[in-house]
Amino acid sequence: MAVTGGGRPAVRQQAARGKQMQRTFNNVKITLICGFITLLVLRGTVGINLLTYGVGGGGGSDAVAAAEEARVVEDIERILREIRSDTDDDDDDEEEEPLGVDASTTTTTNSTTTTATAARRRSSNHTYTLGPKVTRWNAKRRQWLSRNPGFPSRDARGKPRILLVTGSQPAPCDDAAGDHYLLKATKNKIDYCRIHGIEIVHSMAHLDRELAGYWAKLPLLRRLMLSHPEVEWVWWMDSDALFTDMAFELPLARYDTSNLVIHGYPELLFAKRSWIALNTGSFLLRNCQWSLELLDAWAPMGPKGRVRDEAGKVLTASLTGRPAFEADDQSALIHILLTQKERWMEKVYVEDKYFLHGFWAGLVDKYEEMMERHHPGLGDERWPFVTHFVGCKPCGGYGDYPRERCLGGMERAFNFADNQVLRLYGFRHRSLASARVRRVANRTDNPLVNKEAALKMDAKIES
Protein backbone atom coordinates (compact mmCIF):
# COMPACT_ATOMS: atom_id res chain seq x y z
CA MET A 1 0.00 0.00 0.00
CA ALA A 2 1.39 3.38 -1.01
CA VAL A 3 1.42 5.98 1.69
CA THR A 4 0.55 9.29 0.08
CA GLY A 5 0.75 11.53 3.13
CA GLY A 6 -2.73 13.10 2.91
CA GLY A 7 -2.05 15.47 5.84
CA ARG A 8 0.86 17.20 4.14
CA PRO A 9 -1.21 19.80 2.18
CA ALA A 10 -2.76 21.02 5.46
CA VAL A 11 0.68 21.20 7.02
CA ARG A 12 1.99 23.21 4.07
CA GLN A 13 -1.01 25.60 4.27
CA GLN A 14 -0.45 26.08 8.00
CA ALA A 15 3.23 26.79 7.36
CA ALA A 16 2.29 29.31 4.66
CA ARG A 17 -0.09 31.09 7.08
CA GLY A 18 2.66 31.17 9.66
CA LYS A 19 4.99 32.73 7.12
CA GLN A 20 2.35 35.36 6.26
CA MET A 21 1.85 36.25 9.93
CA GLN A 22 5.61 36.50 10.43
CA ARG A 23 5.88 38.78 7.41
CA THR A 24 3.04 40.99 8.74
CA PHE A 25 4.72 41.20 12.14
CA ASN A 26 7.99 42.20 10.49
CA ASN A 27 6.22 44.94 8.54
CA VAL A 28 4.67 46.31 11.75
CA LYS A 29 8.05 46.15 13.44
CA ILE A 30 9.67 48.03 10.56
CA THR A 31 6.93 50.71 10.74
CA LEU A 32 7.49 51.22 14.48
CA ILE A 33 11.23 51.34 14.04
CA CYS A 34 10.90 53.92 11.25
CA GLY A 35 8.74 56.05 13.58
CA PHE A 36 11.33 55.71 16.30
CA ILE A 37 14.04 56.78 13.86
CA THR A 38 11.99 59.85 12.97
CA LEU A 39 11.77 60.80 16.65
CA LEU A 40 15.50 60.33 17.05
CA VAL A 41 16.20 62.55 14.07
CA LEU A 42 13.85 65.26 15.34
CA ARG A 43 15.28 65.02 18.86
CA GLY A 44 18.80 65.26 17.56
CA THR A 45 17.98 68.16 15.28
CA VAL A 46 16.13 70.13 17.98
CA GLY A 47 18.83 69.40 20.53
CA ILE A 48 21.56 70.52 18.20
CA ASN A 49 19.70 73.73 17.37
CA LEU A 50 19.16 74.51 21.04
CA LEU A 51 22.79 73.85 21.84
CA THR A 52 23.93 75.93 18.92
CA TYR A 53 21.60 78.90 19.05
CA GLY A 54 19.99 78.84 22.52
CA VAL A 55 23.24 78.74 24.48
CA GLY A 56 26.06 81.16 23.78
CA GLY A 57 27.29 79.07 20.82
CA GLY A 58 30.85 78.47 22.05
CA GLY A 59 33.33 75.92 20.69
CA GLY A 60 32.43 73.40 23.42
CA SER A 61 28.83 73.52 22.36
CA ASP A 62 29.86 72.75 18.76
CA ALA A 63 31.77 69.68 19.91
CA VAL A 64 28.82 68.42 21.95
CA ALA A 65 26.51 68.97 18.99
CA ALA A 66 28.82 67.05 16.66
CA ALA A 67 29.05 64.15 19.12
CA GLU A 68 25.27 64.06 19.50
CA GLU A 69 24.78 64.06 15.73
CA ALA A 70 27.31 61.25 15.26
CA ARG A 71 25.56 59.16 17.92
CA VAL A 72 22.19 59.64 16.23
CA VAL A 73 23.63 58.64 12.84
CA GLU A 74 25.25 55.57 14.38
CA ASP A 75 21.96 54.52 15.99
CA ILE A 76 20.15 54.93 12.68
CA GLU A 77 22.74 52.86 10.79
CA ARG A 78 22.64 50.11 13.43
CA ILE A 79 18.86 49.87 13.25
CA LEU A 80 18.92 49.82 9.45
CA ARG A 81 21.47 46.99 9.53
CA GLU A 82 19.16 45.00 11.78
CA ILE A 83 16.25 45.62 9.42
CA ARG A 84 18.30 44.47 6.44
CA SER A 85 19.43 41.38 8.34
CA ASP A 86 15.85 40.43 9.20
CA THR A 87 14.73 40.95 5.61
CA ASP A 88 17.60 38.90 4.19
CA ASP A 89 16.78 36.02 6.54
CA ASP A 90 13.16 36.03 5.37
CA ASP A 91 14.23 36.07 1.72
CA ASP A 92 16.60 33.15 2.26
CA ASP A 93 13.83 31.12 3.87
CA GLU A 94 11.54 31.78 0.92
CA GLU A 95 14.23 30.72 -1.59
CA GLU A 96 15.15 27.56 0.26
CA GLU A 97 11.58 26.40 0.85
CA PRO A 98 11.16 24.62 -2.52
CA LEU A 99 14.48 22.83 -2.03
CA GLY A 100 13.32 21.64 1.34
CA VAL A 101 10.07 20.31 -0.14
CA ASP A 102 12.01 18.53 -2.90
CA ALA A 103 14.34 16.96 -0.39
CA SER A 104 11.53 15.58 1.78
CA THR A 105 9.26 14.39 -1.03
CA THR A 106 9.35 10.68 -1.86
CA THR A 107 8.64 8.98 -5.15
CA THR A 108 5.17 7.98 -3.99
CA THR A 109 4.14 11.53 -3.06
CA ASN A 110 5.39 13.56 -6.02
CA SER A 111 7.34 11.92 -8.82
CA THR A 112 7.55 15.18 -10.77
CA THR A 113 9.48 17.07 -8.11
CA THR A 114 11.74 14.05 -7.57
CA THR A 115 12.56 14.06 -11.27
CA ALA A 116 13.31 17.77 -11.10
CA THR A 117 15.64 17.22 -8.16
CA ALA A 118 17.47 14.47 -10.03
CA ALA A 119 17.77 16.73 -13.07
CA ARG A 120 19.36 19.44 -10.93
CA ARG A 121 21.85 16.92 -9.57
CA ARG A 122 22.73 15.80 -13.09
CA SER A 123 23.18 19.40 -14.22
CA SER A 124 25.69 20.01 -11.43
CA ASN A 125 27.86 17.20 -12.80
CA HIS A 126 27.04 17.41 -16.51
CA THR A 127 29.19 16.71 -19.55
CA TYR A 128 30.44 19.93 -21.08
CA THR A 129 28.67 21.13 -24.22
CA LEU A 130 29.36 23.97 -26.64
CA GLY A 131 25.77 25.15 -26.46
CA PRO A 132 22.19 24.07 -27.14
CA LYS A 133 21.99 21.10 -29.46
CA VAL A 134 21.35 22.06 -33.08
CA THR A 135 19.25 19.69 -35.19
CA ARG A 136 18.33 19.54 -38.88
CA TRP A 137 21.00 22.12 -39.71
CA ASN A 138 21.34 20.95 -43.32
CA ALA A 139 17.65 21.53 -44.04
CA LYS A 140 17.58 24.83 -42.15
CA ARG A 141 20.65 26.03 -44.02
CA ARG A 142 19.19 25.10 -47.42
CA GLN A 143 16.00 26.94 -46.56
CA TRP A 144 17.93 30.03 -45.46
CA LEU A 145 19.98 30.05 -48.67
CA SER A 146 16.85 29.81 -50.80
CA ARG A 147 15.33 32.78 -48.96
CA ASN A 148 18.51 34.87 -49.15
CA PRO A 149 19.81 34.74 -52.72
CA GLY A 150 22.06 37.70 -51.97
CA PHE A 151 24.23 35.37 -49.85
CA PRO A 152 25.10 32.50 -52.21
CA SER A 153 27.13 29.52 -51.01
CA ARG A 154 29.39 29.84 -54.06
CA ASP A 155 31.73 32.68 -54.91
CA ALA A 156 31.94 34.71 -58.13
CA ARG A 157 33.98 31.95 -59.79
CA GLY A 158 31.37 29.32 -58.96
CA LYS A 159 33.48 27.66 -56.27
CA PRO A 160 32.24 26.77 -52.77
CA ARG A 161 32.52 29.73 -50.44
CA ILE A 162 35.34 29.37 -47.89
CA LEU A 163 35.86 31.24 -44.62
CA LEU A 164 39.43 31.15 -43.30
CA VAL A 165 39.49 31.45 -39.51
CA THR A 166 42.52 32.21 -37.37
CA GLY A 167 43.01 33.73 -33.95
CA SER A 168 45.41 35.02 -31.35
CA GLN A 169 45.36 35.85 -27.67
CA PRO A 170 43.57 39.04 -26.53
CA ALA A 171 46.62 40.35 -24.68
CA PRO A 172 49.89 41.49 -26.27
CA CYS A 173 52.75 39.05 -26.73
CA ASP A 174 55.54 38.91 -24.18
CA ASP A 175 57.72 41.11 -26.38
CA ALA A 176 57.43 43.28 -29.47
CA ALA A 177 59.03 40.66 -31.73
CA GLY A 178 56.18 38.26 -31.04
CA ASP A 179 53.58 40.85 -31.99
CA HIS A 180 55.59 41.75 -35.11
CA TYR A 181 55.67 38.17 -36.41
CA LEU A 182 52.04 37.65 -35.49
CA LEU A 183 51.25 40.68 -37.67
CA LYS A 184 53.33 39.23 -40.51
CA ALA A 185 51.53 35.90 -40.27
CA THR A 186 48.17 37.68 -40.42
CA LYS A 187 49.27 39.78 -43.40
CA ASN A 188 50.37 36.56 -45.13
CA LYS A 189 46.91 35.03 -44.67
CA ILE A 190 45.19 38.18 -45.91
CA ASP A 191 47.35 38.10 -49.06
CA TYR A 192 46.44 34.49 -49.83
CA CYS A 193 42.73 35.10 -49.21
CA ARG A 194 42.72 38.23 -51.37
CA ILE A 195 44.34 36.37 -54.27
CA HIS A 196 41.93 33.43 -54.09
CA GLY A 197 38.66 35.15 -53.16
CA ILE A 198 38.46 33.70 -49.65
CA GLU A 199 36.93 35.54 -46.70
CA ILE A 200 38.94 35.73 -43.48
CA VAL A 201 38.16 36.17 -39.78
CA HIS A 202 40.87 36.86 -37.21
CA SER A 203 39.48 36.42 -33.70
CA MET A 204 41.07 37.83 -30.56
CA ALA A 205 38.18 36.92 -28.26
CA HIS A 206 37.83 33.92 -25.97
CA LEU A 207 34.21 32.94 -26.48
CA ASP A 208 34.28 30.39 -23.66
CA ARG A 209 36.52 30.71 -20.61
CA GLU A 210 36.41 26.94 -20.10
CA LEU A 211 38.00 26.28 -23.49
CA ALA A 212 41.25 28.21 -23.40
CA GLY A 213 44.48 27.49 -25.22
CA TYR A 214 44.34 24.89 -27.99
CA TRP A 215 40.62 24.42 -27.42
CA ALA A 216 39.52 28.01 -28.09
CA LYS A 217 38.97 27.22 -31.77
CA LEU A 218 36.02 24.88 -31.13
CA PRO A 219 33.39 27.37 -29.85
CA LEU A 220 34.63 29.90 -32.41
CA LEU A 221 34.18 27.50 -35.34
CA ARG A 222 30.72 26.48 -34.16
CA ARG A 223 29.63 30.08 -33.74
CA LEU A 224 30.87 31.05 -37.19
CA MET A 225 29.23 28.06 -38.87
CA LEU A 226 25.86 28.96 -37.37
CA SER A 227 26.28 32.69 -38.03
CA HIS A 228 27.37 32.28 -41.66
CA PRO A 229 25.11 29.70 -43.34
CA GLU A 230 26.28 31.06 -46.71
CA VAL A 231 29.76 29.59 -46.07
CA GLU A 232 30.29 26.04 -47.37
CA TRP A 233 33.68 25.38 -45.77
CA VAL A 234 35.20 26.79 -42.57
CA TRP A 235 38.99 26.54 -42.64
CA TRP A 236 40.89 26.79 -39.37
CA MET A 237 44.55 27.85 -39.48
CA ASP A 238 46.81 28.45 -36.48
CA SER A 239 48.34 31.88 -36.03
CA ASP A 240 51.86 30.41 -36.35
CA ALA A 241 51.17 28.84 -39.76
CA LEU A 242 51.99 30.67 -43.01
CA PHE A 243 51.00 30.12 -46.62
CA THR A 244 54.18 29.53 -48.62
CA ASP A 245 52.62 28.57 -51.96
CA MET A 246 50.46 31.51 -52.98
CA ALA A 247 49.47 29.86 -56.28
CA PHE A 248 48.15 26.58 -54.88
CA GLU A 249 44.38 26.16 -54.68
CA LEU A 250 42.52 23.63 -52.58
CA PRO A 251 41.28 20.69 -54.69
CA LEU A 252 37.75 21.01 -53.33
CA ALA A 253 36.25 18.64 -55.90
CA ARG A 254 38.26 15.88 -54.23
CA TYR A 255 36.27 16.42 -51.04
CA ASP A 256 32.74 16.28 -52.43
CA THR A 257 31.81 13.36 -50.15
CA SER A 258 33.87 14.50 -47.14
CA ASN A 259 33.07 16.81 -44.25
CA LEU A 260 36.46 17.04 -42.53
CA VAL A 261 39.73 17.53 -44.41
CA ILE A 262 42.86 17.29 -42.30
CA HIS A 263 46.53 16.71 -43.01
CA GLY A 264 47.90 13.42 -41.74
CA TYR A 265 49.24 9.96 -42.41
CA PRO A 266 46.75 7.05 -42.48
CA GLU A 267 49.41 4.49 -41.54
CA LEU A 268 50.42 6.44 -38.44
CA LEU A 269 46.78 6.88 -37.55
CA PHE A 270 45.44 3.34 -37.84
CA ALA A 271 48.47 1.07 -37.61
CA LYS A 272 50.50 2.93 -34.98
CA ARG A 273 47.88 5.07 -33.22
CA SER A 274 50.40 7.90 -33.17
CA TRP A 275 49.50 11.12 -31.40
CA ILE A 276 50.99 13.09 -34.31
CA ALA A 277 49.17 11.14 -37.04
CA LEU A 278 46.98 14.20 -37.70
CA ASN A 279 47.57 17.92 -37.23
CA THR A 280 44.81 20.29 -36.20
CA GLY A 281 46.83 23.40 -37.04
CA SER A 282 45.14 23.56 -40.45
CA PHE A 283 41.92 21.74 -41.35
CA LEU A 284 38.61 22.26 -43.14
CA LEU A 285 35.10 21.59 -41.82
CA ARG A 286 32.06 21.54 -44.04
CA ASN A 287 29.21 23.68 -42.70
CA CYS A 288 26.76 20.85 -42.01
CA GLN A 289 25.01 18.87 -39.28
CA TRP A 290 27.76 16.24 -39.23
CA SER A 291 30.39 18.86 -38.37
CA LEU A 292 28.30 20.33 -35.57
CA GLU A 293 27.93 16.87 -34.07
CA LEU A 294 31.67 16.26 -34.37
CA LEU A 295 32.37 19.49 -32.48
CA ASP A 296 29.90 18.37 -29.79
CA ALA A 297 31.72 15.04 -29.46
CA TRP A 298 35.14 16.73 -29.51
CA ALA A 299 34.57 19.39 -26.84
CA PRO A 300 33.95 17.42 -23.58
CA MET A 301 37.67 16.78 -23.00
CA GLY A 302 38.46 20.49 -23.25
CA PRO A 303 37.25 22.28 -20.08
CA LYS A 304 40.26 23.49 -18.13
CA GLY A 305 41.04 22.04 -14.75
CA ARG A 306 40.38 18.53 -13.56
CA VAL A 307 38.42 17.45 -16.65
CA ARG A 308 41.27 18.36 -18.98
CA ASP A 309 43.88 16.82 -16.67
CA GLU A 310 42.02 13.51 -16.36
CA ALA A 311 41.34 13.40 -20.10
CA GLY A 312 45.06 13.92 -20.70
CA LYS A 313 45.79 10.71 -18.78
CA VAL A 314 43.32 8.82 -20.97
CA LEU A 315 44.88 10.20 -24.16
CA THR A 316 48.43 9.39 -23.03
CA ALA A 317 47.38 5.81 -22.34
CA SER A 318 45.52 5.56 -25.65
CA LEU A 319 47.99 7.11 -28.13
CA THR A 320 51.52 6.05 -28.99
CA GLY A 321 54.31 8.45 -28.08
CA ARG A 322 52.16 11.02 -26.34
CA PRO A 323 53.84 12.70 -23.34
CA ALA A 324 51.94 13.05 -20.07
CA PHE A 325 50.21 16.43 -20.12
CA GLU A 326 46.68 17.83 -20.14
CA ALA A 327 44.30 16.98 -22.97
CA ASP A 328 44.90 18.83 -26.24
CA ASP A 329 42.51 19.17 -29.15
CA GLN A 330 44.69 17.22 -31.60
CA SER A 331 45.03 14.12 -29.40
CA ALA A 332 41.34 14.27 -28.53
CA LEU A 333 40.33 14.27 -32.20
CA ILE A 334 42.63 11.33 -32.99
CA HIS A 335 41.22 9.42 -30.02
CA ILE A 336 37.64 10.05 -31.17
CA LEU A 337 38.35 8.95 -34.74
CA LEU A 338 40.03 5.76 -33.52
CA THR A 339 37.51 4.77 -30.86
CA GLN A 340 34.44 5.78 -32.91
CA LYS A 341 35.74 4.93 -36.36
CA GLU A 342 32.41 3.68 -37.72
CA ARG A 343 30.67 6.87 -36.65
CA TRP A 344 33.08 9.41 -38.16
CA MET A 345 35.77 8.14 -40.52
CA GLU A 346 33.55 7.71 -43.57
CA LYS A 347 33.35 11.52 -43.86
CA VAL A 348 36.99 12.27 -42.96
CA TYR A 349 39.58 12.88 -45.67
CA VAL A 350 43.13 12.43 -44.40
CA GLU A 351 45.12 14.55 -46.86
CA ASP A 352 48.71 13.50 -47.54
CA LYS A 353 49.12 14.55 -51.19
CA TYR A 354 50.10 18.14 -50.40
CA PHE A 355 51.16 20.12 -47.34
CA LEU A 356 47.96 21.40 -45.78
CA HIS A 357 50.32 21.37 -42.81
CA GLY A 358 54.08 21.36 -43.38
CA PHE A 359 56.49 21.05 -40.45
CA TRP A 360 58.78 24.06 -40.64
CA ALA A 361 62.08 22.55 -39.42
CA GLY A 362 62.62 20.53 -42.60
CA LEU A 363 61.48 23.26 -45.00
CA VAL A 364 62.75 26.75 -44.18
CA ASP A 365 66.38 26.05 -45.12
CA LYS A 366 65.42 24.63 -48.53
CA TYR A 367 63.53 27.57 -50.01
CA GLU A 368 66.42 28.69 -52.25
CA GLU A 369 66.74 25.16 -53.62
CA MET A 370 63.00 25.08 -54.27
CA MET A 371 63.21 28.33 -56.24
CA GLU A 372 66.08 26.92 -58.31
CA ARG A 373 64.37 23.65 -59.20
CA HIS A 374 60.59 24.14 -58.95
CA HIS A 375 57.78 26.69 -59.15
CA PRO A 376 54.71 27.70 -57.13
CA GLY A 377 51.45 25.81 -57.45
CA LEU A 378 52.71 22.36 -56.43
CA GLY A 379 51.82 22.50 -52.72
CA ASP A 380 53.90 19.46 -51.73
CA GLU A 381 57.48 18.99 -50.55
CA ARG A 382 58.71 20.64 -53.77
CA TRP A 383 56.95 23.90 -52.87
CA PRO A 384 55.04 23.55 -49.58
CA PHE A 385 51.53 24.95 -49.42
CA VAL A 386 51.66 25.73 -45.67
CA THR A 387 54.66 26.04 -43.38
CA HIS A 388 53.62 25.54 -39.77
CA PHE A 389 55.90 26.60 -36.92
CA VAL A 390 54.86 23.90 -34.48
CA GLY A 391 56.64 24.13 -31.13
CA CYS A 392 57.92 27.68 -31.61
CA LYS A 393 55.49 29.82 -29.59
CA PRO A 394 56.60 33.15 -31.08
CA CYS A 395 54.17 35.10 -28.89
CA GLY A 396 55.78 33.92 -25.67
CA GLY A 397 56.12 30.95 -23.38
CA TYR A 398 58.55 28.08 -23.53
CA GLY A 399 58.92 26.62 -27.01
CA ASP A 400 60.55 23.38 -28.08
CA TYR A 401 63.12 25.18 -30.25
CA PRO A 402 65.49 28.13 -29.74
CA ARG A 403 63.64 31.40 -30.16
CA GLU A 404 66.22 32.85 -32.56
CA ARG A 405 65.90 29.86 -34.86
CA CYS A 406 62.12 30.08 -34.84
CA LEU A 407 61.97 33.80 -35.59
CA GLY A 408 64.62 33.45 -38.28
CA GLY A 409 62.62 30.65 -39.88
CA MET A 410 59.43 32.70 -39.77
CA GLU A 411 61.22 35.61 -41.45
CA ARG A 412 62.40 33.34 -44.26
CA ALA A 413 58.96 31.77 -44.71
CA PHE A 414 57.24 35.15 -44.80
CA ASN A 415 59.66 36.60 -47.36
CA PHE A 416 59.50 33.41 -49.46
CA ALA A 417 55.73 33.85 -49.70
CA ASP A 418 55.89 37.63 -49.97
CA ASN A 419 58.11 37.40 -53.06
CA GLN A 420 55.24 35.63 -54.81
CA VAL A 421 53.00 38.60 -54.00
CA LEU A 422 55.52 41.37 -54.68
CA ARG A 423 56.30 40.11 -58.17
CA LEU A 424 52.83 41.26 -59.21
CA TYR A 425 54.25 44.76 -58.75
CA GLY A 426 57.79 44.13 -59.99
CA PHE A 427 59.57 43.80 -56.64
CA ARG A 428 61.18 41.13 -54.48
CA HIS A 429 63.11 40.87 -51.20
CA ARG A 430 66.86 41.34 -51.39
CA SER A 431 67.20 38.00 -49.63
CA LEU A 432 64.92 35.68 -47.68
CA ALA A 433 66.49 36.98 -44.48
CA SER A 434 65.87 40.65 -45.31
CA ALA A 435 62.75 42.79 -45.11
CA ARG A 436 64.20 45.20 -47.68
CA VAL A 437 62.99 44.92 -51.28
CA ARG A 438 64.37 45.83 -54.70
CA ARG A 439 62.74 46.37 -58.07
CA VAL A 440 63.19 43.56 -60.59
CA ALA A 441 60.75 44.63 -63.34
CA ASN A 442 58.95 47.72 -64.55
CA ARG A 443 55.25 46.84 -64.41
CA THR A 444 54.03 50.36 -65.22
CA ASP A 445 55.24 50.90 -68.80
CA ASN A 446 52.50 48.65 -70.23
CA PRO A 447 50.46 47.77 -67.15
CA LEU A 448 47.63 45.71 -68.66
CA VAL A 449 49.96 43.49 -70.69
CA ASN A 450 52.31 43.12 -67.75
CA LYS A 451 49.39 42.24 -65.50
CA GLU A 452 48.55 39.21 -67.64
CA ALA A 453 52.07 37.91 -67.12
CA ALA A 454 52.12 38.79 -63.44
CA LEU A 455 48.87 36.93 -62.78
CA LYS A 456 50.50 33.64 -63.74
CA MET A 457 51.05 32.81 -60.11
CA ASP A 458 52.56 29.40 -60.87
CA ALA A 459 55.35 30.82 -63.04
CA LYS A 460 58.90 30.11 -61.96
CA ILE A 461 60.46 32.64 -59.60
CA GLU A 462 64.06 33.62 -60.22
CA SER A 463 66.26 32.99 -57.20
Swiss-Prot record:
Its main location: Golgi. Glycans are attached at N110, N125, N442. The chain crosses the membrane at residues 25-47. Keywords: Glycoprotein, Glycosyltransferase, Golgi apparatus, Membrane, Signal-anchor, Transferase, Transmembrane, Transmembrane helix. Residues 103-118 have a biased composition (Low complexity). One of its GO terms (cellular component) is Golgi membrane. It is found in: Golgi apparatus membrane. Its EC number is 2.4.-.-. Residues 87-99 have a biased composition (Acidic residues). Residues 82-125 are annotated as: Disordered. Belongs to the glycosyltransferase 34 family. Probable glycosyltransferase that may be involved in the biosynthesis of xyloglucan. This is Probable glycosyltransferase 3. It comes from Oryza sativa subsp. japonica.
